[in-house]
Amino acid sequence: MKGEEKLWSILNEKLDTLCATNRLPQAIRVAETALEVAKRAFPGAELPLATSFEKLGQLLDQNGDSATAKAYLLKAHAILEKVKPPDQLAIFRSARRLAFLCDNLDRSEEAISFYEKAIAAGTQLEDIPYSDLGTMLNNVALIFRKSGRQKAAEPYYLHALQIYEKQLGPVHADVASVLNNLAVFYTNERRYTEAENVHLRALTIREKLYPPTHPDIAQSKCNLAVVYHSRGDYAKAAEFYRASLKAWEEANEKPSKDYEIVVSNYADLLRSVGEGRKAHQLEVRARKRRSG
């Protein structure tokens, strides 16, 4: 091993020790030195140089300097993309890190690009947790929705559902959660028939897995009530609001934010059909539960 390469290895060992003991300022200084050594020892697009760029970027991000961190992480990623044959795991980790960082910096288009790269690499790897891919797909969908590109969001929800069902089978709590997200998306898009069908699938799964008073069952029933409420089927909406309230109240837990949403929505419905007295009684009952 040449002298510069040996020095680089020694610095990285010291860097690992500093990171393990949470000495961040010292670790950043050592990482900066290791990077300068790597530039001399590994000219060109070599993996050790990418490693040094990435380590310094990660440390700067941990230290709250995300903008500077991004520049180093981008250099690391550019090197990784040139390596032949490509190291898909390294590309996945690098792209995912940049995607989350850009997302946090509100650099939406860059975040989407890196999420796409991470997803593409991750789908080629057998040991990537399905939840990692699902989270990234959901994040891309959220970015599209926030920017008003609703139609672009739907394929990402469907892709996430496909991954979860392939990994877990059709009857699993995580599958129900993905179905719930998709159905809420359809509700927001006023695609009520699709929203109803998908929410019913989620509810069916949850009823197979949980006792009747489980919060997820209460949530599914409330979401279905919102669908019926939104399309003017007040009788069915009231039925599901009551069922959701019953589940929350029989759980004998302190009222949650979700319980308050059900109360508020159902009270609004009651007032809209001239049942103001019942709405008031419902709100009084909810206040008593809050006060305990």
Task: Cite the ranges covered by each PLM segment.
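Short coil/turn linkers that connect adjacent helices within long alpha-helical scaffolds
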Residues: M1-K2, R40-G44, K82-P86, Q124-I128, ...
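Conserved alpha-helical positions within TPR/SEL1-like repeat arrays
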Residues: S9-A20, L47-Q62, L89-N104, S131-K146, ...
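TPR/TPR-like (Sel1-like) alpha-helical repeat modules
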Residues: Y241-K246, V263-S291
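TPR-adjacent "capping" and linker segments in tetratricopeptide-repeat scaffold/adaptor proteins
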Residues: M1-I10
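Amphipathic alpha-helical segments of tetratricopeptide repeats
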Residues: L35-R40, H77-K82, I119-Q124, L161-K166, ...
